Structure formats: C-alpha cells, structure tokens
C-alpha cells in the first residue's frame, strides 16, 4: 500500500548511481519515453516520485553521463535503498545512499531559517 502521508519523511539523502554499462544507461534513459510517451510535467513527475518508502524530490541526469544522482526525503537510509530497488533502478545502475544533514537551496523560501542543529557535529 502506498503511503500518502509523507510529512514524516524529514531526512535528506543523496543517491549516487553508476550505470552498469552504456547499454543499461541507454535503456534507463529511454524508459522515460516509454513511461511518458506524450511527455511529462514537473508536477506529474513529482506526483509519481512519491514512493512507498521514500520520496524522490530532485534528479540530475546528463545525456552523456555514466552516472546520475537524486535527492530523496525519507526516514532512513534503508527506506531509500528499498525505494530505489522497488522502482527497479538497481537493474540499471549500482548506487549508494548518503544522508546529508544540511540541505540549502536557492529554491527554498528566502526567509526560511537554515537548520544548523546537526551541521558538522556542533561539538567539533
């Protein structure tokens, strides 16, 4: 059952993917044309990026790159790993997940305070 309440997904994770081969890279990239033959809006992509275990909020992928990365919101590293596997992305690329305690962006509201509570372990 798809969890629609994503408010509890508070932690930020970056996933770095490395395509298993050039063929797998091409297959992955062309799969979106099959999934969205008439194109897709950012809104529809965002709606589809809410998974059972984690939510993918951003992805960066170059046409000629052998790797790509995504930004996820989730409760745990394990939840992100389960989400990547449930979408089948691991059939195209190896991946590793890194929790990032600090997420700053020019896309966030300009007056939003950046949470530095866990930034670089304040006790260092």
Regions found by a protein language model. Give the residues of each.
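An amphipathic, aromatic/His-enriched active-site/gating alpha helix that lines ligand/cofactor pockets
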Residues: 71-106
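Short S/T/G/P-rich N-terminal loop/turn motif that feeds into the first structured element of a domain
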Residues: 1-57, 61-66, 75-79, 102-124
């Amino acid at each position: 059952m798809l969890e629609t309440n994503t408010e509890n997904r508070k932690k930020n994770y970056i996933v770095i993917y490395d395509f298993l081969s050039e063929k797998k890279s091409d297959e992955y990239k062309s799969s979106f044309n099959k999934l969205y033959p008439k194109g897709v809006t950012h809104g529809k992509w965002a709606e589809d990026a809410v998974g059972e275990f984690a939510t993918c909020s951003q992805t960066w992928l170059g046409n000629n790159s052998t790797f790509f990365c995504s930004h996820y919101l989730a409760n745990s590293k394990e939840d992100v790993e389960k989400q990547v596997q449930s979408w089948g992305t691991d059939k195209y690329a190896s991946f590793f997940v890194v929790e990032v305690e600090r997420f700053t962006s020019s896309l966030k509201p300009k007056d939003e305070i950046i949470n530095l509570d866990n930034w670089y372990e304040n006790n260092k």
